[in-house]
């Protein structure tokens, strides 16, 4: 693989019991790029996203064939530490899910789990993470208030800060703005542009406009298959596949 490739799947099949949800997915994700996964509901894009940090392991009847590599190491090898994998490949979910703790503790929790105990180090890392998530100025005077008192958009940025605190290399985002208003959505999108300078970002979105605004590369999924992938501008102006064109132009979906 090219040295710029941070993560890739090769011949990936995924099953829920006897049902095959993903068919032969081969896709590369480059360093410091945003890749948008698009496609109609049920097409497999979120299932694929959850394969990238083995969240689907939590489903007893699930099964994976093929491989997914992070820095050319197969994340499904038996010796892989899944907790460490999920530190390296962080995830932000569709609905903000802060812990019922203070703003400070939401960010510090993952650091403590990963062995950080020094108070000064924790404080520095919490501030740094909140700054990276563009939230510090809004919460710096109420760090010990409940995170549940934040607005939806602030809660989502807190969840991003929580993911960033443990220094991931890849950030997965499953429709991170779908539950937010337009102003909060704009802040999340601006944040994605900033974060890609440091991270590889993979985002699932139902919004064609959002995919066009935030991503460098777009991958179109349909009925569990990867139909087309390429430069976002090209995909949205000159798609190479009729199914891609029909979906992007709203003929189905």
Curated annotation (Swiss-Prot):
Keywords: ATP-binding, Cell inner membrane, Cell membrane, Membrane, Nucleotide-binding, Phosphate transport, Translocase, Transport
Gene3D superfamilies, alphabetized: P-loop containing nucleotide triphosphate hydrolases (3.40.50.300)
Enzyme class label: translocase
Keyword Signal: no
One GO process term, biological-process aspect: phosphate ion transmembrane transport
Membrane topology: Peripheral membrane protein
Domain ABC transporter: 7-248
Quaternary data: The complex is composed of two ATP-binding proteins (PstB), two transmembrane proteins (PstC and PstA) and a solute-binding protein (PstS).
Function noted in UniProt: Part of the ABC transporter complex PstSACB involved in phosphate import. Responsible for energy coupling to the transport system.
Name by which UniProt lists this protein: Phosphate import ATP-binding protein PstB
Source organism of the structure: Oleidesulfovibrio alaskensis (strain ATCC BAA-1058 / DSM 17464 / G20)
This protein's encoding gene: pstB
């Amino acid at each position: 693989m090219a040295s710029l490739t941070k993560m890739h799947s090769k011949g990936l099949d995924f099953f829920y019991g006897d049902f095959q949800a993903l068919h032969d997915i081969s896709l590369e994700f480059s360093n410091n790029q945003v890749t948008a996964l698009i496609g109609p509901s049920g097409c497999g894009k979120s299932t694929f996203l959850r394969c990238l940090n083995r969240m689907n392991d939590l489903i007893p009847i699930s099964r994976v064939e093929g491989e997914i590599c992070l820095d050319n190491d197969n994340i499904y090898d038996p010796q892989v530490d899944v907790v460490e994998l999920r530190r390296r490949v962080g995830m932000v979910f569709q609905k903000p899910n802060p812990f019922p703790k203070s703003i400070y503790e939401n960010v510090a929790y993952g650091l403590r789990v990963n062995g950080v105990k020094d108070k000064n180090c924790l404080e520095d890392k919490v501030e740094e993470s909140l700054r990276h998530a563009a939230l510090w100025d809004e919460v710096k005077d109420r760090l010990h208030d409940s995170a549940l008192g934040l607005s939806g958009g602030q809660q989502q940025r807190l969840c991003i800060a929580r993911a960033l605190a443990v220094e991931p290399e890849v950030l997965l985002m499953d429709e991170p703005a779908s539950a937010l208003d337009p102003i909060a959505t704009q802040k999340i999108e601006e944040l994605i542009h900033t974060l890609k300078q440091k991270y590889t970002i993979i985002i699932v979105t139902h919004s064609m406009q959002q995919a066009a605004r935030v991503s460098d590369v777009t991958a179109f999924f349909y009925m569990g298959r990867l139909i087309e992938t390429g430069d976002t501008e090209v995909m949205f102006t000159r798609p190479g596949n009729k199914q891609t064109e029909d979906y992007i132009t709203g003929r189905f979906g």
